[in-house]
Swiss-Prot record:
One BP term from GO: photosynthesis
Lineage: Bacteria, Pseudomonadati, Chlorobiota, Chlorobiia, Chlorobiales
Matching Pfam families: Cytochrome-c551 (PF10643)
Purpose: Monoheme cytochrome which is the immediate electron donor to P840 of the photosynthetic reaction center complex.
Name the UniProt record assigns to this protein: Cytochrome c
Record note on modification: Binds 1 heme group per subunit.
Transmembrane segments: 10-30, 49-69, 76-96
Cellular localisation: Cell inner membrane
Keywords: Cell inner membrane, Cell membrane, Electron transport, Heme, Iron, Membrane, Metal-binding, Photosynthesis, Reaction center, Transmembrane, Transmembrane helix, Transport
Record-linked InterPro entries: Cyt_c-like_dom_sf (IPR036909), Cytochrome-c551 (IPR019604)
Organism: Chlorobaculum tepidum (strain ATCC 49652 / DSM 12025 / NBRC 103806 / TLS) (Chlorobium tepidum)
Binding sites annotated in the UniProt record for heme: C152, C155, H156, M182
Subunit structure, as described in the record: Monomer. Component of the photosynthetic reaction center composed of protein subunits PscA, PscC, PscB and PscD. The reaction center interacts with FmoA (which forms the Fenna-Matthews-Olson (FMO) complex). The reaction center/FmoA complex has two PscA subunits, one PscB and one PscD subunit, probably two FmoA complexes and at least one PscC subunit.
Amino acid sequence: MDKNSNGKLIALAVGGAVLMGALFFSVSFLTGYIPAPNHSAILTPLRSFMGWFLLIFCASIIIMGLGKMSSAISDKWFLSFPLSIFVIVMVMFLSLRVYWEKGRTTTVDGKYIRTTAELKEFLNKPAATSDVPPAPAGFDFDAAKKLVDVRCNKCHTLDSVADLFRTKYKKTGQVNLIVKRMQGFPGSGISDDDAKTIGIWLHEKF
């Protein structure tokens, strides 16, 4: 392949990357994407795109290197060839590790979560705000649990939406909002008193 062909391929790759970045950037806003308040609405999707671009770029380097090395392989390459592949792969993963040092998941207060242990710890912390009053003295949690099992598992089980409920609603203090939605469904059978009891149990125990 001559230099002219190489130049065309490089130009095609760069142009495709720019087009992909523009589409990614546009779609992120069309889907209603909103980053955390302390993050830039412009830089955040661009950084995500750069992560994918680096992954593809490093993979391309590996393929290019293997192609060039395969034409010069001899009996003396039995050790240097696999070592070269190992070095290229390690450079790729280290570069991605440095790029994503802050983590892929960001909380609303700007903190980063990198591991499942950190995510579990975050979910177990009590919410900063709540639209549900604290449980009164002598509150019967066992009876409340039975009420929740009867009223709140008609359309789907609570376990099937547990992660969504805990991360999107309970953590943001919107438990009562979900209870009111369930109460509004035809045939829910949830009275106002039931709604208060269910809300307290969901906030305290679920």
